[in-house]
Amino acid sequence: MQNNKKTVVVGLSGGVDSSVAAYLLKKNYNVIGLFMRNWDSLINNDYLGNREINNDICPQELDYKDAQEIARQLDIPLYRVDFVKEYWDYVFENFISEYKKGRTPNPDILCNKYIKFDLFAKHAFNELKTDYIATGHYAKMKNGELYRASDKNKDQSYFLSQLSKEQLKKVLFPLENLTKDEIRKIAREQNLITAAKKDSTGICFIGERKFAKFLQNYIPAKKGNVLDITNQKIVGEHSGCFYYTIGQRKGLNLGGNKESYYVCGKNVAENIIYVAPSSRPEFLESNSLLASNLNLNTNNFNKKNLSAKFRYRQEDSKVKVEFLENNFVKVYYDKAQAITPGQQVVFYDGEKCIGGAVIEEIYLNDKKLTYL
């Protein structure tokens, strides 16, 4: 006998969040699991910095085995789709290109925009004929608009900021009102095999890597000088300016100096890293920025009530936003530190996430910071 329930395709990753998302949806929907494979270490020359390259079974296949077991436990069908080439073309090439320019990109945001909520969604709607898609993201949908999750510590709306209104239209976030502890409790109560599985970390779909080594697979290491920006004196040598981020304090290997340093800028063309003494924090300070590629997922917001995050897990800053032509925005804020070109500025109206843009230039009192 056919039921009248709508169908939802859940992105089953083999982790506890997507497992519980699938379990919760079973109460009201016909649930189909879909596992994505987006990275192949052998095809993608992922050797340096990869602790698992010599394992008999790669982490993605172990995750797939867990997803298969969850599907069996929940009695739902599971399909598998391969986006290795597309992930490289749409996400990873941009990631490497940005690092080559000395910028710090956010691959998770592009992965959501081009893979999870585009290619994955199209496969679910066109091939599996679903009514909705769902993921284990910590985020909330209300009346077709994106909001922060109830668990503010885990909220992932920041990473969904480049999704269009159209992409969000048929998305369900079953974990929107739950904390991580509550999710693990549900998983234990249902004896799900992922109940105690540790959270995935590292680069979206690639995993944990020794980051500088990992980048050397794609960007050759080239040593250069480290300059103290306060006096232009050489204070050390770096192993490649692509491997350092603005605000970085650890791993600089600048021993023998009177005080510790932090990275405050870089000149990729000259292969120079600029550092400043910890007692001089002003080289990280700014109070406005220019951003490109603005994406707004709604026009329903109060321009006078906007706040922004300049990186994930950061407190909101109150902002004034000037909307310019060609999807550029100028953003004004009280003094903030270590805002970095290539990262995403994400806008909120209270709890509502209205979109985001890519940080291009940083200013202090309307003067562009050229050493970034």
Swiss-Prot record:
PANTHER family (UniProt xref): MITOCHONDRIAL TRNA-SPECIFIC 2-THIOURIDYLASE 1 (PTHR11933:SF5), TRNA 5-METHYLAMINOMETHYL-2-THIOURIDYLATE -METHYLTRANSFERASE (PTHR11933)
Enzyme Commission number(s) of this protein: 2.8.1.13
Protein's recorded name: tRNA-specific 2-thiouridylase MnmA
One GO cellular component, as annotated: cytoplasm
Disulfide bond positions: 111-204
GO function term, MF aspect, one: tRNA-uridine 2-sulfurtransferase activity
InterPro entries for this protein: MnmA-like, MnmA-like_C, MnmA-like_central, MnmA-like_central_sf, Rossmann-like_a/b/a_fold
Cited NCBIfam families: PRK00143.1, trmU
Compartmental location: Cytoplasm
Region (Interaction with tRNA): 154-156, 311-312
Name of the gene encoding the protein in the UniProt record: mnmA
Catalytic residues identified in the record: 111, 204
Protein family membership: Belongs to the MnmA/TRMU family.
The protein's role, per its UniProt record: Catalyzes the 2-thiolation of uridine at the wobble position (U34) of tRNA, leading to the formation of s(2)U34.
Binding site for ATP: 11-18, 36, 136
Lineage top rank: taxon: Bacteria
Main location: cytoplasm
Reactions that this protein is recorded to catalyse: S-sulfanyl-L-cysteinyl-[protein] + uridine(34) in tRNA + AH2 + ATP = 2-thiouridine(34) in tRNA + L-cysteinyl-[protein] + A + AMP + diphosphate + H(+)
